[in-house]
């Protein structure tokens, strides 16, 4: 299997070529089981599974229960494969592989919800969300995120940003409008907090996450917002020592810790660390959603509130959102109950791990001086640029090709001058094909490499 990238990437590329050429792999051809392929070619089964899943997500393969994996019919009469997101959305940090959304499982769950729901479920219901989903979600968070979760403490919200808006409004009404955020962090999140009337102050981030010792005047803080599982954009987890120090500070000064469990489900070198809320449920509000694991369009998330905050949050939620999207709640509860959601997470982890590996391999081979940062996890890769390049020039080049890569400078509370040498990129890789990854890296290298760098490769076709 010659060519760039890891074994899974090369196997997928070879199968893709054979399918396009016709011959032995014609539409309807049943592929050998993954175990058989792995044994015949001396590969791990995980490599073969990742290659099959990659091609299924691209529309080259199709699978049916009990009939194996087949070459999809790509002829004119075939059902068109779901369209891939445009390159600019695919490269945006945090965008999942939307082609991998489990449409069949979701449709089956939706039908089951419609069939089984009681007439009363069509009413206004509980502002916290349907009890069945809160029960299933609490069990999932206990088992997979180490949370101290009960159904009564959970609110089902319209995504993490919706839950953060509820918390921000409550902080403002309670006269605690000062909030500390990580520096660097998401510019959109900071804009949301300011829009809700909060005073935002920054706290530096290093290799261990948020620098707790740098928190100034903690007695004046209402809350600290952080991403401890996989910091955005630096990609580092909050260390155990920092977690303990932050919890002590929160309890001593009455500070609410708002944990955005950003990318908490995705770690590729080991099991992801448990959530901070499991260590300190009395002072931590946990935010999560399915925007990264399933699709942003579902607008499904959760807020696990500390006991002292739950009554006020439920009261405020009832004023603006007296009920949720019950059908979606029941469908997601079905996915959780049957194990389909956790199976989907396992599949997507393998796929994203393969794409991240392809990106880091391409950077190492084709872009010397471009240094990946952070731990192996999440849906984005922070990359430090070499000192001879300029972030603004590299961003302009990749965006001109349609890739909405973000700059590290924009994530700082005080952005650096645009002509500053070096800088960095934040590349969303989860929805990029291997061909697009190779092209993007080539464009970035041509714009940010040494003066003698060759030109960029042609765009993927």
Protein language model annotation of sequence segments:
Residues 1-113, 122, 318-324, 333-336, ...:
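N-terminal basic, amphipathic alpha-helical segments
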Residues 76, 184-188, 409-414:
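Short, polar loop motifs at secondary-structure junctions
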Residues 106, 286-349:
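Conserved core segment of the aminotransferase class I/II
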Residues 120-253, 265-267, 271-285, 352, ...:
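Conserved core of the PLP fold type I
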Residues 160, 206-207, 211, 215, ...:
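Hydrophobic multi-pass inner-membrane translocation pores used for secretion
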Residues 179-181, 258, 406:
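Short hydrophobic beta-strand element within catalytic cores of glycosyltransferases
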């Amino acid at each position: 299997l010659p060519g760039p990238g890891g074994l899974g990437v090369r196997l997928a590329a070879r199968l893709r070529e054979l399918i396009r050429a016709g011959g032995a792999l014609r539409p309807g051809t049943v592929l050998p089981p993954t175990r058989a392929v792995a044994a015949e070619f001396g590969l791990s089964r995980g490599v073969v599974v990742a290659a099959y899943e990659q091609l299924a997500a691209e529309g080259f393969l199709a699978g049916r229960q009990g009939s194996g994996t087949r070459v999809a019919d790509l002829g004119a009469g075939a059902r068109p494969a779901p369209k891939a997101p445009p390159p600019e959305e695919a490269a945006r940090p945090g965008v999942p592989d939307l082609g991998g959304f489990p449409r069949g499982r979701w449709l089956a769950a939706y039908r089951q919800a419609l069939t089984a729901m009681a007439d009363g479920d069509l009413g206004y219901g509980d502002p916290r969300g349907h009890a069945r989903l809160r029960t299933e979600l609490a069990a999932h968070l206990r088992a997979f995120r180490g949370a101290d979760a009960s159904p009564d403490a959970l609110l089902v919200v319209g995504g993490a940003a919706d839950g953060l808006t509820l918390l921000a409004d409550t902080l403002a009404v309670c006269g605690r409008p000062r909030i500390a955020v990580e520096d660097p962090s998401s510019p959109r999140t900071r804009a949301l907090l300011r829009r809700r009337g909060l005073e935002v102050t920054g706290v530096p981030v290093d290799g261990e996450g948020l620098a707790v010792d740098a928190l100034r005047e903690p007695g004046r803080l209402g809350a600290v917002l952080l991403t401890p599982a996989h910091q955005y954009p630096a990609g580092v987890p909050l260390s155990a020592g920092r977690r303990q120090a932050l919890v002590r500070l929160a309890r001593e000064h009455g500070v609410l810790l708002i944990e955005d469990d950003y990318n908490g489900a995705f770690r590729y070198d080991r099991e992801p660390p448990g959530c901070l809320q499991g260590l300190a449920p009395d002072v931590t509000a946990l935010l999560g959603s399915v925007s990264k694991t399933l699709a942003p369009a579902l607008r499904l998330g959760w807020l696990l509130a500390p006991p002292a905050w739950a009554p006020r949050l439920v009261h405020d939620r009832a004023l603006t959102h007296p009920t949720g999207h019950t059908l979606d709640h029941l469908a997601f509860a079905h996915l959780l109950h049957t194990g389909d959601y956790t199976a989907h997470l396992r599949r997507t982890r393998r796929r994203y791990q393969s794409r991240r590996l392809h990106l880091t391999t391409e950077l190492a081979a084709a872009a010397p001086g471009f240094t990946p940062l952070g731990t192996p996890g999440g849906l984005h890769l922070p990359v430090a640029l070499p000192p001879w390049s300029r972030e603004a020039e590299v961003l302009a080049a990749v965006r001109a090709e349609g890739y909405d890569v973000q700059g590290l400078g924009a994530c700082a509370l005080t952005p650096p001058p645009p002509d500053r040498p070096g800088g960095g990129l934040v590349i969303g890789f989860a929805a990029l094909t291997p061909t697009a990854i190779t092209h993007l890296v080539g464009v970035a290298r041509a714009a940010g490499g040494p003066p003698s760098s060759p030109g960029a490769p042609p765009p993927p076709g």
